[in-house]
Amino acid sequence: MSKEKEEIKIIAQNRKAFHDYFIEETYEAGIELVGTEVKSVRQGKVNLKDSFARVENNEVILYNMHISPYEKGNIFNKDPLRPRKLLLHRHEINKLSGYVSRKGYTLIPTKVYLKRGLVKVELAVAKGKKLFDKREDIARRDAKRELEKQFKEKQLGI
């Protein structure tokens, strides 16, 4: 029996994280949500800007992830910015707490997606970039773009 490719639907991405941080390692984590939050996530009403995670009491908690209230949720809607527990294996939590205990490392969510009907968060172990690192990345990207442009012109014979 052949394995089918797992269906992944990306709901939200934190593009700013790749600009502001060096991504060391990523983990896939489940997230503890209530019913109306799941419905909002399925509609794509998630914002990862300024969100981060911490290891507290051997649990990973996600802060500042905004999930808009579900329109038809009435009294069952929760606070959009409430802390949410991430579901990881114990050995993964221990590894993450080891990373975070080192100076300069933090946990940043980079993606929220649906995998086989379940809401998942891609959590990255990240180290903050300095201003000169960001400038260096921009210069490298511009140089690469210029080289590709020259190569394309040479190919076309312009």
Swiss-Prot record:
Record's keyword annotation contains RNA-binding: yes
Record Gene3D superfamilies: 2.40.280.10
Keywords, ordered alphabetically: Cytoplasm, RNA-binding
GO cellular component: cytosol
Disulfide cysteine pairs (residue numbers): none
A single MF term (Gene Ontology): RNA binding
Pfam family, one: SmpB
InterPro entries named in the record: SmpB, SsrA-bd_prot, SsrA-bd_prot_CS
Example GO BP: trans-translation
Chief location of this protein within or outside the cell: cytoplasm
Cellular localization per UniProt: Cytoplasm
Role noted for this protein: Required for rescue of stalled ribosomes mediated by trans-translation. Binds to transfer-messenger RNA (tmRNA), required for stable association of tmRNA with ribosomes. tmRNA and SmpB together mimic tRNA shape, replacing the anticodon stem-loop with SmpB. tmRNA is encoded by the ssrA gene; the 2 termini fold to resemble tRNA(Ala) and it encodes a 'tag peptide', a short internal open reading frame. During trans-translation Ala-aminoacylated tmRNA acts like a tRNA, entering the A-site of stalled ribosomes, displacing the stalled mRNA.
HAMAP family the UniProt entry points to: SmpB
Family stated for the protein in its record: Belongs to the SmpB family.
Protein name: SsrA-binding protein
Organism in which the protein naturally occurs: Caldanaerobacter subterraneus subsp. tengcongensis (strain DSM 15242 / JCM 11007 / NBRC 100824 / MB4)
